[in-house]
UniProtKB/Swiss-Prot annotation:
Cofactor annotation comment: Binds 1 [2Fe-2S] cluster per subunit. This cluster acts as a Lewis acid cofactor.
Modified residues (N6-carboxylysine): 124
Function: Functions in the biosynthesis of branched-chain amino acids. Catalyzes the dehydration of (2R,3R)-2,3-dihydroxy-3-methylpentanoate (2,3-dihydroxy-3-methylvalerate) into 2-oxo-3-methylpentanoate (2-oxo-3-methylvalerate) and of (2R)-2,3-dihydroxy-3-methylbutanoate (2,3-dihydroxyisovalerate) into 2-oxo-3-methylbutanoate (2-oxoisovalerate), the penultimate precursor to L-isoleucine and L-valine, respectively.
Protein name: Dihydroxy-acid dehydratase
Subunit structure: Homodimer.
Annotated PANTHER family: D-XYLONATE DEHYDRATASE, D-XYLONATE DEHYDRATASE YAGF-RELATED
Required co-factors: [2Fe-2S] cluster; Mg(2+)
Gene3D superfamilies assigned: IlvD/EDD C-terminal domain-like
Keyword Isomerase belongs to the record: no
Reaction(s) the record says it catalyses: (2R)-2,3-dihydroxy-3-methylbutanoate = 3-methyl-2-oxobutanoate + H2O; (2R,3R)-2,3-dihydroxy-3-methylpentanoate = (S)-3-methyl-2-oxopentanoate + H2O
Keyword Iron: yes
Catalytic residues of the enzyme: 517 (proton acceptor)
GO cellular component term, pick one: cytosol
Amino acid sequence: MPKYRSATTTHGRNMAGARALWRATGVKDEDFGKPIIAVVNSFTQFVPGHVHLKDMGQLVAGEIEKAGGIAKEFNTIAVDDGIAMGHGGMLYSLPSRELIADSVEYMVNAHCADAMVCISNCDKITPGMLMAALRLNIPVIFVSGGPMEAGKTKLSDQILKLDLVDAMIQGADPTVSDEQSEQIERSACPTCGSCSGMFTANSMNCLTEALGLSQPGNGSMLATHADREQLFINAGKRIVDLTKRYYLNDDDTALPRNIANKKAFENAMALDIAMGGSTNTVLHLLAAAKEGDIDFDMDDIDRMSRLIPHLCKVAPSTPKYHMEDVHRAGGVYSILGELDRAGLLHNDTHNILGQTFAESLAEYDIAVTESQAVKDFFRAGPAGIRTTKAFSQSCRWDTLDDDRTNGCIRSKEHAFSQDGGLAVLSGNIAIKGCIVKTAGVDENSLVFSGPAVVFESQDTAVEGILGGKVKSGDVVVIRYEGPKGGPGMQEMLYPTTYLKSIGLGKECALITDGRFSGGTSGLSIGHVSPEAAAGGTIGLVNDGDIINIDIPNRSIELHVDDTELAQRRATADQQGWKPVNRQREVSYALRAYALLATSADQGAIRDKSKLEG
């Protein structure tokens, strides 16, 4: 039977100094011998998705202590991708994921914590904590801050639902008046919480449900709704039970690597494809799997993308539905239920509730549950009141959206498309693959061919797009923006936003070794691997080269003969695979990240071979 890790610091005369310090934090005589549970918070006033988390740590801590544990809270950093976007700050976003994972490892191992509750929400925080959880492999429960309410405003006598991307597009569109742009800006982000569409933050928080590491509703219950408080309370109670199951009952099914195993990762990917999640989730799932020594890679994602239908279409892929609508339709468990009925889910995997998914779906899938409490839980809706306070309203929808023919969530028979919401493409320009969010691609653009217009950075791409260098039918290529080449693998939301603002959103393709915001839609292909800085073919593309994209056949090809490519490669080898005439200040912290970074097909994790003797 494993003993508490914390016993290293709480037992034995030689640990008198450590106990003295524990006492100084409030630990009493009768507490020694209880499990020490880290409450890993991420409160910051910089990020709307985290601005309301200040009191959440102590809410969870109180429940842990009532249930017989010792709770100790600490914070990680949290970067807001929307605020960091469009300038040098975006270089720091993806690297912050590794920093978060490392900081959790440092704190938990330095103080010998026995388990942890991870309070996350936004883009890199949930993935960073997930990587740490699988690296440490101690009992863990995730509970997120919850999504923001969708914005609403009245234009031309119509009530429009809005999100951050609407504000960005309107702000970039020269045909939109200053007054209308400001109206959209003031209405787009009305409350605390992660941005209201199926962007990266909400996608990842939904995926923790499918991985079995969070409770039903974690990804969809609004940050402002009073019902969300119960998720935090239950997390505090359940983590103590989970901890005792492992340490006192020798039950290793309570450990995250046994919950989030290969089958669970396949469930999470199935959910991601079915709900048209952010392409960033692919990057983060690959990275988390590597941390847990789980055999899950791009081949698995490619295989699944050919099997899973697109069952849930949410902003930015449609203006009709936001996360509040997903929740009204039953949230993640309703999507999982539809996948299960289609034979596309491993329902024998377990979760932190101590149930198999078959058991949990019987209780939490609104299509089959007999529980009125569960149905009421999923009727929790928006209040439409601007606020930064959690649990500040108790509004409910009059009815659930249980329409699986024309609703927000659909059955396989009535899917938005039988082809899923994400796809892996490969070819000579992306030998190790690349990712496209097919949920956001116009059906007329699924097969596309055009001449390349090449840019060596996001900044020059924006200048070129706004300066008229891109025309209808072009394939915009933005390279040297990968994990190593950026460094930091910036999001390309501004180039795609500006293409939309000048009427080319459906007229052009964009490919990059960088990545995209969860708010991106259109024919936007990212994560091209290997990246240019690692010798990838994307670094050999010249202006005017024809690129063919065929999403149904999962191919992307540069039409340049092998002899010419070999000559270009020899030249690039001599030049060291560096961008031409790019001026960019890169700090030593980012240079250190770049030295170890792998391409996107590996999740942009560190190259461990460079750290091993």
